[in-house]
């Protein structure tokens, strides 16, 4: 069904031939215009017959301007939302463009001046810090000089003056030994655990065990620190844990296993410690006891022993000799190790035992001069009167007044490599020094 053109007034417009439409898009030259006028065809208008929208203005680069405006407002504490009005109203922004540009320049100048002021303040603060640190360094230097002056006045030799050797820890030695003196009070075993805790063992059993461990440590060429730590672990464990006599040797080898792992470069294996007990204890038993000991001491193996203090005290004693006196070191170590087997020496602090060993060793080697001097008193922190009981008890061990038959320590220090210092005794008793 077809509709008439009268019913659709725009039908003629819709049914325009494609040729006419295409001709409207052909370029109009002068010759084509004459031909078209001759045929009665109207030339297409140069301007559109319908109303067009107003041409938009050319886009301008406003990104920097808007960013500078927002940044400056932010620095002033303004609101970004308020600045969006400037972006929505280009006419007003165009009118005030010059003013905003001037404001931006002013803000930039202000910010530069603020930055310069802040930089100057920072530099002044740094200069003050440098001057303060220099003042502190000078104050510390003055204190050190004052301290050295006091030591010279007291005739104390500075054994920490060798700052070139990093192993000496000269700068920290005093602080280190301050902490060690505190630690020996906190981690010492009970002096009467045989009476309070143990019921199946006695001091003689402990003496036999430790004398045997001295022999084991010498056979395996273990360092003295291993032996001292072994005895320390034994006493700490026995101070709070009951043990039967059948397991006392198991405790000893397990403690030496732990100490060897902690102190030695190459520790003996578990099988070695089982072997030295004639396989009385199996590997699982030794490992089980090792775990029990470590849990009991909470894995605190870094403890001050007599050997810890003995190194420093011997160094202080050697300061009075032009050439190091090797017999003094061997003899002091011998006297200190004699105390390991004696349960009664638990009542003395390790530092006191070390100081007494140096005192008695110096007296044994030379009776013409008093064994104590300001340097030893300064570094050991003990006066002569405080050493009396320990030195007298140690002299009894040296002379073996009790007739003890356990001689592992004596045989060890009778060897030529230790200058046979176990044979040395003093012709004069040390009691004469305390009666003055």
Swiss-Prot record:
Residues spanning the signal sequence: none
Disulfide-linked positions: none
Chaperone listed as a keyword: no
GO BP annotation list: cell division; mitotic cell cycle phase transition; positive regulation of stomatal complex development; regulation of G2/M transition of mitotic cell cycle
Recorded superkingdom: Eukaryota
InterPro entries: Cyclin, Cyclin-like_dom, Cyclin-like_sf, Cyclin_A/B-like, Cyclin_C-dom, Cyclin_N, Cyclins_cyclin-box
Keyword Cell division: yes
Keywords attached to this entry: Cell cycle, Cell division, Cyclin
UniProt-recorded Gene Ontology molecular function terms: cyclin-dependent protein serine/threonine kinase regulator activity
Classification via PANTHER family: CYCLINS
Protein name: Cyclin-A2-2
Source organism of this protein record: Arabidopsis thaliana (Mouse-ear cress)
